[in-house]
């Protein structure tokens, strides 16, 4: 049986959309803007790093990062992100969302700058220091996932909560675009100031000494939006749900939200104390009671995020083939180092503009209309369909006259990842767990996703290699080929459909309804259905 809600929480649930909602979206969203910039800008400069630090005299093609170095440079931030999601998620429940929120930004600011200052006399030393700082950059980025999602969900009203939380996540799309646009500007400026011949004409002269500044400037620029947001985050009040339900301070919660909502709210400290005495609310994380109430939900959020990120991040494998096929990136030897940065940045920006960003904002528009479950199910379904449609007739798509069709199918997979599970896996864990575990459980779910990202980004990089050892990329062992890898990804997406049935629908419900925190007794089960009943 449900009890009467605390007035301060009810006021938040029924509040009309106000300016403070948009302020919270901007403050939290700028963190995700920075996260995406920092995580994805490395892909813009890895080719340049290969030219600068791994040039081979007399080689027909420009230098490239060795496979182990490329894996480390691209993947170390994911490792840091995973660790940060677990640590800051736990800390957000222990110390409060606000106290920890500023820490993540400071780590991101310092490590963005430090990444651009990576030093050493030998290429290995430069790459080692770059990897060190990018690990800790990822650590700060990881903290932003559970904290931003939790803060936004706890501030939002129940009618438009999904749109607000997914809008924060959608800022990633703008971060990816900003990285590409900034790289275009920087590379254009350096090309105009320091023109140089193509690699085929002058191998050594094609990489100017000033190119070493280009990648450093691009990496360090990530500190700017993070630094600009720090003051605003420090002025945000603690969320009422943490203050009331975890810190047990109804007076402070009412005072904070009275200022935010600009309404008079009664503290109700006595009612809160009565709620706190109930033994049913004393169960711990991973206790028998927790597992009976939320175990399947946690399995649902972790498994779907894990499976989604395997598919989502492995799609980057095919970008180089697609960009080359449609002429966005000419052969490396036909360009100088700075021109290559420009071409890669332009391609990434176009992909973000045409498929990534629209997908995010379709989710924002429809998540509170058709629900999280429907969007996630639809996204996984279409990702499965398009992956098999690419895989089964793969030889058909390799013919030059059919490559545009391949690009369209590929873009649609990206679109339905973002208008689908890439957004919903972020939203749902912030809505369905009790306040005292909310940040931790979101961190666990997100960390599971980053584990999937590592499998997708690196496992499939090896898996997709040609079975013929003479046709593999330099330094890689034979794999199962692109076609078979696409079939595996189709199966992964299909598993995502099945595990989605473990994830409850939270559209239109309060956080306390979803978590069972408004139930009167120990035997009351959370009645949120996994599959929505129409």
Swiss-Prot record:
Tissue: Mostly expressed in roots, in tissues connecting the lateral roots to the primary root. Also present in flowers, in senescing anther filaments and in the abscission zone at the base of siliques. Expressed in hydathodes and axillary buds, and in some senescing leaves. After Pi starvation, localized in all cells of undifferentiated root segments, including root tips and root hairs, and in the epidermis, cortex and stellar regions of mature root segments.
Keyword line: Cell membrane, Membrane, Phosphate transport, Phosphoprotein, Symport, Transmembrane, Transmembrane helix, Transport, Ubl conjugation
The record's account of how the chain is modified after translation: Ubiquitinated by NLA. Ubiquitination of PHT1-4 leads to its degradation by the proteasome.
Induction (UniProt): In roots by phosphate starvation. Repressed by the Pi analog phosphite (Phi).
Modified residues (Phosphoserine): 524, 528
PROSITE patterns per the UniProt record, alphabetical: MFS
GO MF entries: phosphate transmembrane transporter activity; symporter activity
Predominant location category: membrane
Translocase keyword on record: no
A Pfam family reported for this protein in Swiss-Prot or TrEMBL: Sugar_tr
Topology, Extracellular side: 46-70, 121-131, 183-211, 315-349, 394-403, 464-484
Region: Disordered, residue numbers: 512-534
Membrane topology: Multi-pass membrane protein
Membrane-spanning segments: 25-45, 71-91, 100-120, 132-152, 162-182, 212-232, 294-314, 350-370, 373-393, 404-424, 443-463, 485-505
InterPro entries: MFS_dom, MFS_sugar_transport-like, MFS_trans_sf, Phos_permease
Gene3D superfamilies: MFS general substrate transporter like domains
GO biological process: phosphate ion transport
CC per GO annotation: Golgi apparatus; plasma membrane; plasmodesma; vacuole
Subcellular location: Cell membrane
Miscellaneous information on this protein: Although related to the sugar transporter family, it does not transport sugars.
Subunit structure: Interacts with NLA.
Primary role: High-affinity transporter for external inorganic phosphate. Acts as a H(+):phosphate symporter in both low- and high-Pi conditions. Confers sensitivity to arsenate.
Family indicated by similarity: Belongs to the major facilitator superfamily. Phosphate:H(+) symporter (TC 2.A.1.9) family.
Name of the protein: Inorganic phosphate transporter 1-4
Natural source organism: Arabidopsis thaliana
